[in-house]
Regions:
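Rossmann-like NAD(P)-binding element
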Residues: 278-279, 293-340
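Short, well-ordered beta-strand core segments
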Residues: 41, 63-64, 123, 247, ...
């Protein structure tokens, strides 16, 4: 039984290591050793088995998961494809169409869907991954089931050859120049045209091309950048969040009105600031039309719309902004400001 302690099964590689020389043993070789075991190997999954973690699970002969488990191949979001056999084993497990979806979207698949697709053999009733794995392993032994390497499964590779070009066309329209989704299609297509060993070689070639791409470097830079902006230098983890009750939004145009609506929906009072009364009136009119449209669609009740409109107050000039700034300086719990 292969399982992980803590909050999750293997959740993928350390992104900080991407692009650096890899040491031995290579992950694909470790997975091959697991798959070639003469004894059945059960992967007991929980949390979020992602990327290389899911590839390890695919190298096992059977897979059982705790309720709430979500699995995926998010490499595409970082400009990559699964590089340790994921594009070759996944279509053998769940079929070509489902594999294309997972590899090119990077979405997380919940346990119930994974079971339906064939990615899982069972969803456990236990709350502990080791106990779940042992229970399932005993069932395998009682049934005298043999090892079941996915590398030898070819039945689910049958598909309409046109699916690959259709998927590429959809992705070109949707992803607008992103390379890794198309690379994922190429790798999954290789699984249907080459034997497993040759498919693995092709996957590796495609993975290396992605790894050397400036797009991959840019996407990983953006990944870390998005997380860095959430950290305030010099602010300790013990610092309590500041309570914000009122916000000033400068500009009542389309974007400013949208920001004001979002803040009002969050329960905040909004001072909407413009230079002229005409601009203020136009901005408030747009906000009311947006709320009326939400009521017409049924996404808001009339009472909710009026409540949000009531939290949005008009103001001319920068006096209110000055008040907001003074409020921050004098009472950090009362007022903030933003500009659109």
């Amino acid at each position: 039984v292969l399982y992980a302690a803590g909050r999750t099964f293997i959740a993928g590689a350390d992104i900080k290591e991407f692009g650096k020389p890899q040491g031995d043993p290579q992950l694909r070789d470790v997975i091959a050793a697991i798959e070639n075991s003469p004894k059945p190997v059960v992967a007991a999954l929980h949390g979020t088995p992602l990327g290389g973690g899911l590839e390890v699970a695919l190298g096992c002969h059977y897979r059982v998961a705790l309720p709430g488990t979500r699995a995926g191949t998010p490499e595409v979001k970082l400009g990559l494809i699964p590089g340790a056999g994921g594009t070759q084993r996944l279509p053998r497990a769940i079929g070509v169409e489902a594999a294309l979806d997972m590899v090119t979207s990077g979405r997380f698949v919940p346990a119930e869907e994974a079971l339906e697709l064939g990615l899982l053999d069972a969803i456990a009733t236990e709350s502990d991954p080791l106990a779940a794995g042992v229970t399932f392993a005993k069932e395998i032994l009682d049934a005298k089931l043999p090892p079941r390497p996915l590398s030898g499964w070819n039945d689910r590779l049958a598909c309409d050859p046109g699916i690959f070009d259709e998927t590429r066309e959809k992705l070109r329209r949707k992803t607008r120049g992103q390379l890794s989704p198309l690379a994922g299609v190429d790798a999954v297509e290789a699984a249907t045209k080459l034997d497993f060993a040759e498919g693995m070689k092709r996957e590796r070639e495609i993975f290396r091309d992605c790894m050397e791409s400036p797009q991959r470097a840019a996407l990983i830079h953006a990944f870390f950048g998005e997380r860095a902006v959430a950290k305030v230098p010099g602010l300790s983890e013990e610092t309590a969040p500041r309570e914000v009750n009122s916000v000033a939004v400068i500009g009542a145009g389309t974007m400013g009105g949208g920001i004001a609506l979002a803040l009002a929906a969050a329960g905040l009072h909004v001072d909407l600031i413009e230079k002229s009364q005409d601009a203020l009136d136009a901005g408030l009119s747009r906000i009311r039309k947006t709320l009326d449209s939400s009521v017409s669609r049924g996404s808001l009740t009339a009472a909710q719309a009026e409540e949000r409109l009531g939290r949005t107050g008009p103001a001319r000039g920068s006096d209110h902004l000055g008040g907001a700034a003074a409020g921050r300086a004098g009472n950090r719990r009362e007022k903030s400001s933003t500009s659109s």
